[in-house]
């Protein structure tokens, strides 16, 4: 399961939020395959159990906790669960489902709050607890946040775009603060990944027109990129950046094809 035939994270521990989602799952499985002792969390109990089984087939069984990061008690419960053995690696992939109907003038307050709380608030406060523990243990830890192209380009998902924009700046703020302690903080902005947070069909998206590489990405494209960013051997001097993994999608503006 290791990409290079070596265990990039042997002897290290990792915490992955949103681990039952498409991308979160791929990252958690890759981390386990690279030798990390993984803790996984998600709001979906059944899918989280499936991920735990998948990881158990390739490495030691993960620790897992069901959590709802849209409220304060959720991230606190996760932290209390791992505080006795804090992770060396933190990946924040949790994100509520988003819908195309959540337009600026129609998105409901509860939906807006759940998005901001899960992506931004929980990402900040849980990440801060993890980072403080890393610094106290003199660990050259890594924090990785799953952001989005919509952090900089609007797409009628105001709560989602705003939360991801906040996460992108949070990466930079954390990186400035934690760099002197040897802790690296980065983000990944995925492109069009079917099976992610909202449905995308090839017929409606026309990837060959909008994606220079001519195909959708997949969860493992993101997971492999995450392994590179998290590896101190390969990316040990990279911090405060957001890596765009989109096959070139950002090279097109959404108005390039106004009929869509």
Placement of each model-derived feature along the sequence:
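Catalytic loop of short-chain dehydrogenase/reductase
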Residues: 142-166, 171-180
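Active-site loop of short-chain dehydrogenase/reductase
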Residues: 12, 86-88, 134-148, 180-183, ...
């Amino acid at each position: 399961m290791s990409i290079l035939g070596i265990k990039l994270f042997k002897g290290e521990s990792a915490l992955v939020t949103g681990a039952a989602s498409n991308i979160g799952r791929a990252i958690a499985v890759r981390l386990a395959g690279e030798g990390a002792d993984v803790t996984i969390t998600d709001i979906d109990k059944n899918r989280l159990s499936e991920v735990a089984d998948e990881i158990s087939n390739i490495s030691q069984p993960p620790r897992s906790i069901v959590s709802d990061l849209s409220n304060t008690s959720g991230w606190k419960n996760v932290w209390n669960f791992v505080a006795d053995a804090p992770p060396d690696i933190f990946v924040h992939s949790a994100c509520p489902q988003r819908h195309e109907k959540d337009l600026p003038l129609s998105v409901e307050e509860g939906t807006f709050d759940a998005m901001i709380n899960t992506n931004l608030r929980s990402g900040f406060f849980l990440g801060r607890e993890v980072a403080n523990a890393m610094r106290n243990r003199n660990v050259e830890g890594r924090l990785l946040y799953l952001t989005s192209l919509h952090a900089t380009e609007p797409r009628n998902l105001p709560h989602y775009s705003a939360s991801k924009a906040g996460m992108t700046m949070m990466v930079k703020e954390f990186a400035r603060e934690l760099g002197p302690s040897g802790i690296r903080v980065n983000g990944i902005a995925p492109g069009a990944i079917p099976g992610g947070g909202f449905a995308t069909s090839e017929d409606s998206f026309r990837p060959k027109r909008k994606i220079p590489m001519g195909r959708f990405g997949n969860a493992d494209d993101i997971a492999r990129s995450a392994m590179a960013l998290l590896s101190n051997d390969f990316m040990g001097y990279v911090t405060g950046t957001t890596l765009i993994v989109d096959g070139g999608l950002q090279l097109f503006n959404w108005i390039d094809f106004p009929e869509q």
